[in-house]
UniProtKB/Swiss-Prot annotation:
Belongs to the conotoxin T superfamily. The keyword Phosphoprotein does not apply. This is Conotoxin ViVA. Keywords: Amidation, Disulfide bond, Pyrrolidone carboxylic acid, Secreted, Signal, Toxin. It comes from Conus virgo. The lineage of its organism: Eukaryota, Metazoa, Spiralia, Lophotrochozoa, Mollusca.
Length: 59
């Protein structure tokens, strides 16, 4: 019966130990979603202008 409290304490410690090992995300890893979206539009626009000139954006 003495093992039951020890087992319960170990079960409670396991989730907290895994969260301590996770490193916080730094700001340099963050990529603004707007820049990703703009890059995708730029690439699609460039490919579209090569194949179909009518779909090019003005400006």
């Amino acid at each position: 019966m003495r093992c039951v409290p020890v087992f319960i304490i170990l079960l409670l410690l396991i989730p907290s130990a895994s969260s301590a090992a996770v490193q916080p995300k730094t700001e340099k890893d963050d990529v603004p979603l707007a820049s990703v979206h703009d890059s995708a539009l730029r690439i699609l626009s460039r490919q579209c202008c090569i194949t179909i000139p009518e779909c090019c954006r003005i400006g």
